[in-house]
A protein has these predicted regions:
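A loop-to-helix transmembrane entry motif
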Residues: 74, 98-110
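Membrane-embedded alpha-helical segments that form the functional core of polytopic membrane enzymes
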Residues: 18-72
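Acidic (Asp/Glu-rich) catalytic motifs at the cytosolic membrane interface
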Residues: 48-89, 110-118
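Short juxtamembrane and helix-loop transition motifs at transmembrane-helix boundaries
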Residues: 11-18, 60-72, 93-98, 120-128
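Membrane-interface loop-to-helix entry segments
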Residues: 26, 76-83, 129-140
């Protein structure tokens, strides 16, 4: 049988290791942003962004599946994802004026989702994982970015309408149950 000092020491070691894992997870998630600048430069220079954007999205899904899903990592993931959308869409909007309406609609959806999730976090101390809804919005946004980067105004406007509709439809689930505790650290939609 272990004495109380050994138990406390082991508990402290487990907490220390858990904290180190969380810091590593947050660091790896934040590291994904480095790929965003490359994508933004490609967009600014009128070069294809599809492969780099696909790699970024695969990394996003992979880090969500592999890394610890702590509240701090979820917040970091949301910040990185939002910063990525803002950075790339900013460059696309400067280069392709026909993309601006779609970009504005997607941005409004991002703001509404972010505000809903921030409100829920403030009220309940729970972060939100958007799941399939956020994934659908991200794919629609990426589709808009890839099509806009190809420089076809008609297709860009159509892609903007589609992305706006998908983002609007996927924002609604973030509003359900907002501010009501789920009893978990991560609210999953």
């Amino acid at each position: 049988m272990k004495n109380p000092e050994q138990k406390n020491s082991e508990k402290h070691d487990v907490q220390h290791i858990s904290r180190l894992r969380e810091v590593a997870s947050v660091g790896l998630t934040a590291l994904r942003y480095s790929g965003v600048e490359y994508i933004a430069r490609q967009a600014r220079d009128g070069k294809p962004i599809g492969p780099a954007l696909a790699a970024f999205m695969v990394a996003d899904v992979a880090d969500g599946q592999i890394l610890d899903d702590t509240p701090l990592r979820r917040v970091t993931d949301g910040v990185v994802d939002t910063a990525a959308v803002v950075r790339v869409m900013y460059e696309l909007g400067k280069r392709y004026p026909e993309a601006r309406a779609g970009i504005a609609a997607v941005a409004l959806g991002q703001v509404a989702t972010g505000a809903a999730n921030a409100y829920h976090l403030a009220k309940t101390s729970e972060v939100t994982k958007g799941g399939r809804y956020k994934r659908a919005a991200n794919i629609a946004t990426a589709m808009l970015a890839i099509i806009a980067a190809r420089g076809n105004p008609r297709r860009t406007r159509l892609a903007g309408c589609i992305a706006a509709g998908v983002v609007a439809a996927t924002t609604v689930p973030h509003l359900r149950g907002i501010g009501k505790p789920t009893g978990k650290k991560v609210r999953r939609l």
